[in-house]
Amino acid sequence: MKCFQKLYIFILILIVLMAGCESNKITGDSKETQIKKSFAKTLDVYPTKNLEDFYDKEGYRDGEFKKGDKGKWVIRSEMTTELKNENMVSKGMVIRLNRNSRTCTGEYFVRIVKEDSEGKVYSDERKYPVKMENNKIITLKPIDDEKVKKEIEEFKFFVQYGNFKELENYKDGEVTYNPEAPIYSAQYQLKNSDYNVEQLRKRYNITTKKAPKLLLKGSGNLKGSSVGYKNIEFTFVENKEENIYFTDSINFNPSEDK
């Protein structure tokens, strides 16, 4: 009889544990879906070939916006490469499209992170101010470096050619969520045949053949927030000796001029 009672209790505990595991699984899947939906609102603008279209695009608005403020779009794309025994080099551009004045300014930047003989790390960054007119990036100051000048002339933001129509097909992501911060993320292993991976390889000298991981990382309310951020990162290589990754972000904020 005692054996039967012990067996009954054991089975009961097992059922409760299994139910708890299943409950956690459902919650996890639900959170991944929520993160996807939160990012979908931002990723829907990919691709937007003509950047001036953002003057007429409305973003998420909350109490941070003053009355009459149409807001501004902040768009940033950056490629970082650190090969073995070489400096880490980041090149990219950020622009701010003011929907009130329908003007756009920003800067192209080149950042080099170096390590001296004593192991001290320091950063050297150069910024080149730009503006946008008729969907064309124009430098505001003369540039002597022909290589940099060409990089600016040929620069395209990821939002102009990226496409996330396959987002729903990304499965089994590594999901993290901290409701206190709040910070959330979902990471997926991609294939080299992925459209966005192919586009990045066409435009950048990516030396590795490894397929990247896609990280969707955000902060603020999952339902929307003008004070949070949403970043996209394609990581091809990440270790102590080498790093190759591409980052992109599009955020809608108060313009601060109202």
Swiss-Prot record:
Q: Name one GO cellular component term.
A: plasma membrane
The places in or outside the cell where this protein is found are: Cell membrane
Q: Which domain of life is it from?
A: Bacteria
Q: Where are the N-palmitoyl cysteine lipid anchors? A: 21
Query: What is stated as this protein's family in its record?
Result: Belongs to the staphylococcal tandem lipoprotein family.
Q: Which InterPro entries match?
A: Csa, Csa_sf
The record's keywords, sorted A to Z, are: Cell membrane, Lipoprotein, Membrane, Palmitate, Signal
Q: What is the lineage of its organism?
A: Bacteria, Bacillati, Bacillota, Bacilli, Bacillales
Membrane topology listed for this record: Lipid-anchor
S-diacylglycerol cysteine lipid attachment residues:
21
What NCBIfam families does the record point to? Answer: SA_tandem_lipo
* Origin species: Staphylococcus aureus (strain USA300)
What coarse category fits the chief subcellular location reported for this protein? Answer: membrane
**Which protein, by its recorded name, is this?**
Uncharacterized lipoprotein SAUSA300_0416
**Signal peptide bounds:** 1-20
